[in-house]
Curated annotation (Swiss-Prot):
Residues that make up the propeptide removed upon maturation: 40-70
Secretion signal, residue range per the UniProt entry: 1-23
Task of the protein: Antimicrobial peptide with potent activity against bacteria. Has strong antibacterial activity against Gram-positive bacteria S.aureus, M.luteus, B.subtilis, and Gram-negative bacteria E.coli, P.aeruginosa and N.gonorrhoeae. Also shows low activity against HIV-1 PV.
Family statement drawn from the similarity comment of this UniProt entry: Belongs to the non-disulfide-bridged peptide (NDBP) superfamily. Short antimicrobial peptide (group 4) family.
PTM-bearing positions, type Phenylalanine amide: 36
Full protein name: Peptide BmKn2
Keywords noted in UniProt: Amidation, Antibiotic, Antimicrobial, Antiviral protein, Cleavage on pair of basic residues, Membrane, Secreted, Signal, Target cell membrane, Target membrane, Transmembrane
Tissue and organ expression note: Expressed by the venom gland.
Origin superkingdom: Eukaryota
Other information: The mutant Kn2-7 shows antiviral activities against HIV-1 (EC(50)=2.76 ug/ml). This activity is correlated with a direct interaction between the mutant and HIV-1 envelope.
Record localization: Secreted; Target cell membrane
Organism: Olivierus martensii
Example GO BP: defense response to bacterium
Entry annotated with the keyword Membrane: yes
Length: 70
């Protein structure tokens, strides 16, 4: 009976360790996809698409300041 209890406890701890490591690996994969994903790379170029010939350099500078924390 003691060996069965020990075996059950061991399996529960093993399953907990596997699920925790899976969540950790998933979080790392999610972070990497956010950093290197296509959407993230496109979002870094937002100022490139704001170019309008009628805007002055001061206007662009003001827009960049406004978009810094967006």
């Amino acid at each position: 009976m003691k060996s069965q209890t020990f075996f059950l406890l061991f399996l529960v701890v093993l399953l907990l360790a596997i699920s925790q490591s899976e969540a950790f690996i998933g979080a790392i994969a999610n972070l990497l996809s956010k950093i290197f994903g296509k959407r993230s790379m496109r979002d870094m170029d937002t100022m490139k698409y704001l170019y309008d010939p009628s805007l002055s350099a001061a206007d662009l500078k003001t827009l960049q300041k406004l978009m810094e924390n967006y």
